[in-house]
């Protein structure tokens, strides 16, 4: 799971919010620690894995909204990794941007047909950014940092 490596290789610091393992073996979010770290460490961007990989936790609507509200309150951009959304067997996957209109201003949603359709070798994904300002910044970074585009996305 390369989140930490990607963060550090881009000159940023990791503020890890470790999941709480409950007695029944399930996992929960430590919301107090999550918000405390945002405030104390000046977090600007939150990488949210939903459903969680590798623990396969499907977050409830209330949990997702609580995270979203904390991020709204502190002006934190959310990168919502929803690449495993098609593999939910129990519960319902909660799409962050569908829960509240305000979340669209701070959310970058990542999806991919790779896992669902066994196409991981293509190394493609969908990046959905409703906010025009965020989208423009992202497009600029793609051009500056990657300097290469997949032939299938050139038209996009």
Please name every model-derived segment:
Residues 1-14, 149:
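Substrate-binding/gating loop at the entrance of the active-site cleft, primarily
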Residues 3, 67, 96:
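Aromatic/hydrophobic pocket-lining residues that form π-stacking "cages" and hydrophobic walls in ligand
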Residues 5-7, 70, 99:
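Hydrophobic/aromatic ligand-binding patch that stacks against planar heteroaromatic rings
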Residues 7-12, 30-31, 60-63, 91-95, ...:
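Short, glycine/charged-enriched secondary-structure capping and boundary segments
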Residues 9, 101-156:
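Conserved core segment of the aminotransferase class I/II
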Residues 12, 73-77, 104-105:
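A short helix->loop->beta-strand "cap" motif at the edges of active sites that frequently abuts
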Residues 19-91:
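Active-site phosphate-binding strand-loop segment of PLP-dependent enzymes
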């Amino acid at each position: 799971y390369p989140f930490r490596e990607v963060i550090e290789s881009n000159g940023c610091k990791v503020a890890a919010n470790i999941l709480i393992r409950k007695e029944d073996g399930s996992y929960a979010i430590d919301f107090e620690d999550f918000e405390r770290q945002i405030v104390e460490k000046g977090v600007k961007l939150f990488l949210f894995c939903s459903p969680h990989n590798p623990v396969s936790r499907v977050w409830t609507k209330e949990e997702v909204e609580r995270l979203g509200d904390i991020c709204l309150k502190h002006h934190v951009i959310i990168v919502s990794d929803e690449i495993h959304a098609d593999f939910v067997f129990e519960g319902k996957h909660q799409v962050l941007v569908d829960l509240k209109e305000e979340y669209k201003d701070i959310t970058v949603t990542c999806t991919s047909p790779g896992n669902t359709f066994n196409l991981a070798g293509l190394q493609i994904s969908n990046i959905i950014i409703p906010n025009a300002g965020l989208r423009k910044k992202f497009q600029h970074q793609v051009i500056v940092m990657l300097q290469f585009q997949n032939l299938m996305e050139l038209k996009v």
